[in-house]
Amino acid sequence: MGAAAVRWHLYLLLALGARGRLVGGSGLPGAVDVDECSEGTDDCHIDAICQNTPKSYKCLCKPGYKGEGRQCEDIDECENDYYNGGCVHDCINIPGNYRCTCFDGFMLAHDGHNCLDVDECQDNNGGCQQICVNAMGSYECQCHSGFFLSDNQHTCIHRSNEGMNCMNKDHGCAHICRETPKGGVACDCRPGFDLAQNQKDCTLTCNYGNGGCQHSCEDTDTGPMCGCHQKYALHADGRTCIEKDEAAIERSQFNATSVADVDKRVKRRLLMETCAVNNGGCDRTCKDTATGVRCSCPVGFTLQPDGKTCKDINECLMNNGGCDHFCRNTVGSFECGCQKGHKLLTDERTCQDIDECSFERTCDHICINSPGSFQCLCRRGYTLYGTTHCGDVDECSMNNGSCEQGCVNTKGSYECVCPPGRRLHWNQKDCVEMNGCLSRSKASAQAQLSCGKVGGVENCFLSCLGHSLFMPDSESSYILSCGVPGLQGKTLPKRNGTSSSTGPGCSDAPTTPIRQKARFKIRDAKCHLQPRSQERAKDTLRHPLLDNCHVTFVTLKCDSSKKRRRGRKSPSKEVSHITAEFEVEMKVDEASGTCEADCMRKRAEQSLQAAIKILRKSIGRNQFYVQVLGTEYEVAQRPAKALEGTGTCGIGQILQDGKCVPCAPGTYFSGDPGQCMPCVSGTYQDMEGQLSCTPCPSSEGLGLAGARNVSECGGQCSPGYFSADGFKPCQACPVGTYQPEPGRTGCFPCGGGLLTKHTGTASFQDCEAKVHCSPGHHYNTTTHRCIRCPVGTYQPEFGQNHCISCPGNTSTDFDGSTNVTHCKNQHCGGELGDYTGYIESPNYPGDYPANAECVWHIAPPPKRRILIVVPEIFLPIEDECGDVLVMRKSASPTSVTTYETCQTYERPIAFTSRSRKLWIQFKSNEANSGKGFQVPYVTYDEDYQQLIEDIVRDGRLYASENHQEILKDKKLIKALFDVLAHPQNYFKYTAQESKEMFPRSFIKLLRSKVSRFLRPYK
């Protein structure tokens, strides 16, 4: 218990004693004293103690505070007037108290004030690859003969004897020997040392391990000069500090002329029984009083019942030390730590979740943050690989995409195609015969264009009658379509390279749809699909724009952009463009002898062009609306208009638990109530956030409400069954065939003469193969053997007859892969800029591929140098340096090397390039793999070279875990690099922002470096 706590208890005793006397009846007879303190009617400060007195009360500031009681302010024990609180290194003031901390490389002593050296070599060899040597306040790594210490000061580089002058032991360098481009050697010093005038020796400075001093250090021309706190004296070794009483005894014993003189002094001290003798028996602090000695303990310790001994307080036992997550007790203090995925805030108590989704390049598609972690998801048609990346799924590699005939893979999807003379079935998988030349002319209209005048202004409408699709691209961009393009147009190419969508002997002209594309502009409006208010959506007598043809497909793509007006002070305007594509079909049944097919087509084309002219005027005046399921939507919003009925979410979304979520599959967004409504029976919806449901292929209206895909529509044949149209009545797949999907018109043969045990099977696994293949293999129905999946494919299941292609441009290291995680991107990652950039191993943060080789070149602009930060690197040491990252001046093995490693290091390191340009190479062998690396860099003005090197070479930058986390925090590194690359950007960050971003010790370290750089002479 500290002295401040003792004073606190004394104040409590005084207050209780005063109250007891009043209860005992002291005072004037009959007088009733009012206890303002207990009634709370006093006006004492919150940091004061209320002491009741006869007829009044007193306010006494609590220990650690000063003032007259009604106003109390904290005493800053760390000020010079209080001798830094008795702390030999750093003093941190806290309300009503203070706390001592030590420089990196030291730990707090039992007295809570002194600082003792930490032997870093005891913990994982100090991170040194070979030899670790402890020193006062620091440590240093050394290498065995034939090795050089790399610039990260931990790893050792081995070089051959050829052309290496530094291999000569007589090179004369005290610390580091470097090869120069012109030949010969140049000496350098370890961090915290200055190169002497002879350019060979190294002079220790206070930047390295506090200059070897236990307390204070001051740089002089001859090296560090050590000093001690006022209660201590410098030991004869010139570095260590001892208490003055102890030092006085040592000096007096040294100067004693006789044993008798010493005996007299000892006897006198024993008789006096004061703190001068054996510190009064106190473990820590001793104070002489009228009744004898009184022992006390520093902050972080408590006095034991013997009144002499001090015991460390385990702060972690009381409310976990105030730490959010982990609490680690230390001698006289404690430290807080956080779980993985969290960071410690600058109050050194609170843990905050790291929002990885706020970082750049975290996920390719969708990022979902969660406490302590995050998850990457991919959009439909893509699959996850390498932890965060999304690659297109090649559905055609999985049993031909279940297509009956041809399969064409596309980005995020795929299409089944049919041979000439056949068309796609409604299930988009099977091919059926075309019903003559007029099959397309019988297609019903999917949309309708109409206009009507309101108040002299013509309003035009696009009414979606059938299938609609809404795809929001951003806050100011979306795509809306009605109908299905080219419903019967997907065909397989002929042998001569052409394709056909009609039956034999039919002309293409009557059945080919008319397609027209147009671009419209809306001034001073932003793309925002919004339900139109009921007051504005009045009944209007409308007339169709196209009465001689069917509109089978319309798509509207709306995107907005800012366009600056003329004049410097003119604000920019919002300009929106709508790109529309129309697909119409003639009403061939209206053909006559006076106007046959060609004539009808020409009239339809003229009608479509005339309709586009009318639409251009309507859209330009923002009088164009889209109608879906009875709800009218405005396609764009003018800034002056208030967004009515939007709530806080966009179209297709509703508010749930404070978040905007899209309407789920099986539902659609109804703009009138602004809610998600279930699909009615006979319709389905397999996508999120849509404005309508798609009619089921069956016209009978079967199926349950809320169908989430076409397979949930009623009346379809179940898996293992088929029919001519895919609807009931159905028959079972014959023996030797199977069908895994509903609503199909046929079954797939097992192949190779294989049979099934019974009819109605739904999987190839039901085929009686002669061998049951394990994952990583597929069954060959020709040879009846299990074949390993080739490189670039995988198979996670048993008994399959195919392998799945790796997503995107990824591949596998070997054949026989069993999981998509084995698929790796072979591309060497990174972005190389003049001021900032990064390099990363292929497939990062997933494991890099085997036999990879990457080369990067960093060439900064003139008069700029390169600073590199390696937050962490994962290279398996089991490979015996088969995977290597090297940075040097050029591709020549003899050029100046800046960094080289073949090991895993989770401790970050920062260093400057030894050459103006960098050639970087990463190579991996065929053995073990690892996560690899993502290494950022920044180029800075060479005038700051001395300052930057002084910072990155100071061991204090890496000793603290808080400092290490800074070099791993992508947001903080980005902020630091922003200022280093462009110093004027420093003024973007306020002092408060800096305090909230960085720990106090880190700011103090940088401030001292910058001050020394700007004012080198005192």
From Swiss-Prot:
Subcellular location: Secreted; Cell membrane
GO CC terms of this entry: cell surface; external side of plasma membrane; extracellular space
Keyword Ligase: no
Glycosylation sites: N255, N400, N496, N709, N780, N809, N819
Segments of skewed composition (Polar residues): 496-512
InterPro entries: cEGF (IPR026823), CUB_dom (IPR000859), EGF-like_Ca-bd_dom (IPR001881), EGF-like_dom (IPR000742), EGF-type_Asp/Asn_hydroxyl_site (IPR000152), EGF_Ca-bd_CS (IPR018097), EGF_dom (IPR024731), Growth_fac_rcpt_cys_sf (IPR009030)
Factors inducing expression: Down-regulated by inflammatory cytokines.
Post-translational modification: N-glycosylated. Could be proteolytically cleaved to release a smaller active fragment.
SMART domains: CUB (SM00042), EGF (SM00181), EGF_CA (SM00179), Ephrin_rec_like (SM01411)
Membrane-topology descriptor: Peripheral membrane protein
Gene Ontology molecular function: any one: calcium ion binding
Keywords, comma-separated and alphabetical: Calcium, Cell membrane, Disulfide bond, EGF-like domain, Glycoprotein, Membrane, Repeat, Secreted, Signal
Biological process according to GO: positive regulation of smoothened signaling pathway
Residues of the signal peptide: 1-20
Disulfide bonds: C37-C50, C44-C59, C61-C72, C78-C91, C87-C100, C102-C115, C121-C132, C128-C141, C316-C327, C323-C336, C338-C351, C357-C367, C363-C376, C378-C390, C396-C407, C403-C416, C828-C854, C881-C902
Described function: Could function as an adhesive molecule and its matrix bound and soluble fragments may play a critical role in vascular biology.
Quaternary structure (record): Forms homooligomers and heterooligomers with SCUBE2 and SCUBE3.
UniProt xrefs under PANTHER family: SIGNAL PEPTIDE, CUB AND EGF-LIKE DOMAIN-CONTAINING (PTHR24046), SIGNAL PEPTIDE, CUB AND EGF-LIKE DOMAIN-CONTAINING PROTEIN 1 (PTHR24046:SF4)
Designated name of the protein: Signal peptide, CUB and EGF-like domain-containing protein 1
